[in-house]
Amino acid sequence: MCPPSAINISPVFRGPTTPAAVCFQVIRLKQPVTRTHLFQHSTHSQPTIARAVTALIDAHLVRERPDKIVAEGPGRPKIPLEMTPTPWVHVGVALGTKSTYLGIYGTRGQLLREQFVEITPAKHRMSAFIAEIIPHINAMVASTQLPLANIGISASGVVREQKFITAPNLGWDGEDIVTPFARLFDVPITVASVVEAIAGAEQQTQEPPLRPIGSEPLADHRGLIFYVDDTTGAAIHTRTSV
C-alpha cells in the first residue's frame, strides 16, 4: 500500500469553489439553465448567485437567452442562461512515446482542432523536440482566429514542481519543458502527469450537487482512476481536488 506521505494533492486541478466558478461549471454542463437551477446546485444565497451571473455576463462568458424562455405559470419568467461562443482558445499537449497529440479547445471544453505529430522525444534534444511541435501549435491557433488563453501539457512518468518531467519512455530525466514554452508563449502553462490530467478531466464533468436540505451533509463524489500504458499510475478525484 502506498504510504500517506507518497500521496500528493494536485496543485493543478481544483474543482470550482467560488460562486462564479460554480455557476460557470453548471452552465457549461447543463446549458441552458436558469438562475433558479444555479441556486439549487450551490450553497450560496440568491443575491450571491445573481452577482456571480452578472460577473460572468460582464466577462463575456455567459449570455441571457430571452428567446428560450419556457412559460411555467404565473410570475416573472425565468430567463435561460448559456455560454457565449468561446472568446479564446486553450491548447492541450499530450506527450507520447512516438507521437504527440495537440488539441485546441473552447471554453466549454469542446474540441475545435486536433493533430498528431509523429515524433519520438527520446531521439531529440528538448529544444529540437519543442521546435518541431511549436509550428503546428501556432498554425492551429491561428486557424481559429481567436487569442490563446493558456497551454496544458500532460506527460507520462513523474512531473515535479509543475515543470520537470522524468519519463524513461521519453528519454527525459528531470527535463524542464515549461521554460522553453514560456519563452514563446506569453500565457499560463501547466504541466501534469497523464493520470493526473485524466482525473482532472473527469473532475470537470461533475455537476455540483443539489443544495442540501436542512442539516443534511453535502453529497460527496469520488472517482478512482488507474492508468496503464507507457507508464502506470493511479489517481482519486473528488469535486474539489485530485
Q: Can you say where each PLM-predicted feature lies in the sequence?
A:
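Extreme N-terminal segment that seeds HTH/winged-HTH DNA-binding domains in transcriptional regulators
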Residues: 1-41
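Beta-hairpin "wing" of winged helix-turn-helix
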Residues: 57-74
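A short, glycine- and basic residue-enriched loop/turn
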Residues: 30, 68-70, 217
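Glycine-rich phosphate-binding loop and adjoining helix at the ATP-binding site
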Residues: 111, 118-214, 221
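Gly/Thr-rich phosphate-binding beta-strand-loop-beta motif of the actin/hexokinase/Hsp70
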Residues: 75-113, 222-242
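Short, hydrophobic-biased segments on the C-terminal half of alpha helices
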Residues: 53-54
